[in-house]
Amino acid sequence: MASGDIATVANAELDLPYGSALTSSGRISAVTEPGELSVHYPFPTMDLVVLDDALKYGSRAAKARFAVYIGPLGADTAATAREILANVPTPENAVLLAVSPDQRAIEVVYGADVKGRGIESAAPLGVSAAAASFKEGNLIDGLISAVRVMSAGVSPA
């Protein structure tokens, strides 16, 4: 490209379903009609079942609620993660793993009742486990690994 040229991107015609659009970041965004349920899930059902099991059994073992958030975290990722934690049932006894793939951010926040039970050392290990899988392109595997590592490191109350 020479100085002053305008960069253009070739836009191949995509056969997108009704209500779908290609965003500037290259992702496909889709909506459904009001009152209809979406049948297009971002992850295979079996992956969601395994994640649900990790959350359920991890929460039971640690006697603390584990939760996962995937989405944008804004400019202050830690503050946004704390806001999301406040909306989790029993936020004082909860651990939230918040991941923003577009920002390449991973945050772990937890309530006051979990503090001092091992989460301080388990959280960095969970983030490391997640990041290793994320680098390989495995979002769900990273979430599952992080939840398992962190829940194993938190002692029951």
UniProtKB/Swiss-Prot annotation:
<keyword id="KW-1017">Isopeptide bond</keyword>
<keyword id="KW-0832">Ubl conjugation</keyword>
<protein>
    <recommendedName>
        <fullName>Uncharacterized protein MSMEG_4692/MSMEI_4575</fullName>
    </recommendedName>
</protein>
<dbReference type="Pfam" id="PF17174">
    <property type="entry name" value="DUF5130"/>
</dbReference>
<feature type="cross-link" description="Isoglutamyl lysine isopeptide (Lys-Gln) (interchain with Q-Cter in protein Pup)">
    <location>
        <position position="115"/>
    </location>
</feature>
<dbReference type="InterPro" id="IPR033437">
    <property type="entry name" value="DUF5130"/>
</dbReference>
